[in-house]
């Protein structure tokens, strides 16, 4: 069993602490460290990949007899992405280009960044995943990859996304495959659309329900496919190690909120079909998860995995905070 801690969201902790921290991690009974390898940090300058800090960390892990799980944080994109791939910004449900920004839990890089339906964005993201895989696939103490952290793609969008031309084109293509033709869609939906360009996603409930539910279904399938594509890139350069992904919670509990559509991060059952395993996060104190809720979460993920590897990818071990709010310590079981 991999029993470990997450460490290093670049550039913290400072390098002067790494040696003593890894020594304490091992002495505390852990056997694994999970490291975030962030695209925005590694390729801060276009076409120049810098892994010096991660090289040192995996070296220290080996020295202290710790396995490593490497998380490819491709969704935290480089600050230059909009400049080098013009016209790739996400568009929200108000028709506004989304202004990306740094995330509260990571020091450098932007989210949501550019839309992965833009082929130029996906090409660059895939190259980061491939380059990272080639660099570390040969590690003797590599325990596996977490190919997509919490299945996040729209953090900091501040509204519903994505309505950019590339996503709309992908949505209409998905509809055509689903219904066979525009006539087939009109028959199923009881509509009179004259051309595919007239078919728009629903934005909110009752605007209208049919178009809204269809777009939500598309976003779920889109996330599933994106995870499969990430997996394919990594598997091509690492045919040996476990490749998983995990959501912030099981997909069955992902009901959406004012800034996200329900299950827009993919369906765990379909995700597991193309991955080596599936996982989830759990923050018992932060989200008031009791023992029954915790057990339900694990059972949901195990059900989706259907015999594949199951990881509790993140588990709150201490206090948590959002802004200046503070929370109590995690209660013992």
Tell what function each PLM region has.
Residues 1-3, 29-31, 62-68, 138-143, ...:
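Short, well-ordered coil/turn segments that N-cap beta-strands
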Residues 5, 25, 33, 61, ...:
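Conserved, mostly hydrophobic/aromatic
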Residues 1-17, 25:
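Boundary/entry segment of secreted carbohydrate-active catalytic domains
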Residues 18-102, 129-133, 224-238, 242:
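Aromatic-lined substrate-binding rim segments of carbohydrate-active enzymes
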Residues 93-277, 281-294:
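Polysaccharide-binding and catalytic clefts of secreted carbohydrate-active enzymes
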Residues 21-29, 58-64, 134-140, 267-273, ...:
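Acidic (Asp/Glu)-rich catalytic clusters
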Residues 286-333:
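Carbohydrate-binding surfaces of carbohydrate-active enzymes
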Residues 8-9, 34-40, 71-80, 143-152, ...:
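Short, solvent-exposed turn/loop segments enriched in Gly/Ser/Thr/Pro and often Arg
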């Amino acid at each position: 069993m991999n029993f470990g801690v997450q460490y290093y969201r670049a550039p913290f902790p400072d390098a002067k602490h790494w040696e003593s921290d890894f020594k304490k991690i091992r002495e505390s009974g852990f056997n694994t460290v999970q490291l975030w390898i962030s695209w925005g940090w590694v390729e801060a300058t276009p076409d120049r990949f810098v892994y010096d800090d991660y090289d040192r960390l995996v070296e220290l892990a080996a020295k202290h007899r710790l396995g490593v799980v490497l998380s490819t944080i491709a969704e935290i994109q480089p600050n230059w992405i909009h400049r080098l791939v013009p016209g790739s910004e996400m568009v929200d449900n108000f028709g506004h280009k989304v202004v990306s920004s740094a995330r509260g839990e990571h020091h450098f890089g932007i989210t949501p960044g550019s839309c992965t339906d833009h082929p130029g964005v996906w090409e660059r993201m895939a190259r980061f995943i491939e380059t990272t895989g080639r660099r570390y696939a040969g590690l003797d103490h590599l325990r596996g990859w977490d190919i997509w952290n919490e299945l996040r793609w729209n953090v900091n969008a501040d509204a519903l996304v994505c309505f950019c031309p590339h996503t709309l084109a992908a949505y209409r293509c998905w509809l055509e495959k689903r219904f066979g033709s525009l006539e087939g869609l009109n028959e199923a939906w009881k509509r009179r659309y004259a051309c595919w360009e007239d078919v728009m996603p629903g934005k909110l409930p009752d605007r209208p329900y049919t178009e809204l539910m269809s777009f939500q279904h598309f976003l779920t399938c889109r996330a599933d496919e994106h995870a499969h594509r990430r997996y394919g890139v990594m598997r091509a350069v690492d045919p040996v190690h476990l490749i998983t992904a995990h959501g912030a919670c099981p997909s069955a509990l992902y009901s959406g909120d004012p800034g996200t559509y329900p299950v827009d991060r993919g369906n765990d059952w379909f995700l597991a079909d193309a991955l080596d395993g599936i996982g989830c996060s759990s923050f018992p104190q932060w989200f008031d998860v009791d023992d029954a809720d915790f057990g339900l979460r694990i059972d949901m993920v195990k059900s989706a995995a259907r015999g594949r590897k199951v990881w509790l990818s993140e588990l709150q071990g201490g206090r948590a905070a959002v802004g200046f709010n503070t929370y109590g310590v995690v209660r013992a079981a």
